[in-house]
């Protein structure tokens, strides 16, 4: 018991130390900017740390410590529970196509669910009926690449009901995939896949067709 208490005290002491001396915005781009932190190691040695943010300088999470999600991704199944809606999208950093969940940014004044419905039509052409049941904590903001950016995103769940046609922007190159479980497993084995998509494909493989959102309940 004494050993455990000592470890807890060490953790508190470590968390209380000073981690940085200052922060500076280094770029002034429209959508994404680079920040430099004058960081301090555990022994006080200074080093350079860099991260990117979509937020303006006053709202970077380094300052606000907010969990507010900048974007969301959509776990959308067909009405029979047999297929998961994916996108295969060209991504410039990889110079290749990646399998992903439909996703996008939450616009000012939108809820995450409203953004999900809008993005589903834009990216896939499918109307989305949002599923609201289950544990609310599963829909809160979670950080995406915390070593590189302060961005967080939430997950929205639902069923696609009607195909009305894609409304992609000219800058987007997106193919819509309706993946059954056999195709989902193939994608996991063979394709280039985003982390969020990979995790939810694993979930889809184990989900019941008759109760596709049962995993949202504790």
Model-derived segments and spans:
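Short, Lys/Arg-enriched N-terminal segments with co-localized hydrophobic residues
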Residues: 2-9
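Alpha-helical and coiled-coil interaction segments, frequently adjacent to or embedded
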Residues: 9-34, 45, 74
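Acidic, metal-coordinating catalytic segment for phosphate/diphosphate chemistry
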Residues: 29-73, 80
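Short loop segments at secondary-structure junctions
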Residues: 42-43, 78-81, 90, 159-164, ...
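Conserved Nudix-box catalytic region and its N-terminal flanking loop in Nudix hydrolases
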Residues: 63-118
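Unchanged
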Residues: 70-73, 104-196, 215-218
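Short, amphipathic C-terminal "tail helix"
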Residues: 200-218
């Amino acid at each position: 018991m004494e050993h455990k208490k000592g470890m807890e005290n060490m953790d508190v002491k470590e968390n209380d130390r000073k981690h940085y001396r200052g922060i500076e915005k280094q770029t002034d781009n429209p959508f994404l900017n680079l920040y430099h932190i004058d960081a301090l190691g555990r022994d006080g040695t200074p080093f350079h740390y860099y991260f990117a943010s979509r937020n303006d300088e006053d709202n970077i999470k380094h300052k606000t410590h907010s969990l507010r999600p900048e974007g969301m991704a959509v776990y959308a199944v067909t009405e029979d529970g047999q297929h998961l809606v994916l996108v295969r999208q060209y991504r410039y950093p990889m110079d290749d196509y990646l399998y992903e969940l439909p996703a996008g940014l939450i616009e000012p004044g939108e809820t995450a669910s409203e953004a999900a419905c809008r993005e589903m039509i834009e990216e896939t052409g499918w109307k989305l009926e949002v599923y609201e049941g289950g544990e609310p904590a599963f829909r809160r903001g979670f950080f995406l690449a915390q070593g590189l950016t302060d961005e967080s995103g939430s997950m929205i769940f639902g069923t696609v009901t009607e195909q009305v046609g894609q409304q992609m922007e000219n800058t987007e190159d997106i193919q819509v995939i309706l993946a059954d479980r056999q195709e989902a497993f193939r994608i996991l084995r063979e394709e280039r896949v985003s982390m969020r998509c990979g995790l939810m494909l694993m979930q889809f493989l184990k989900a019941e067709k008759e109760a596709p959102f049962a995993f949202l309940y504790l």
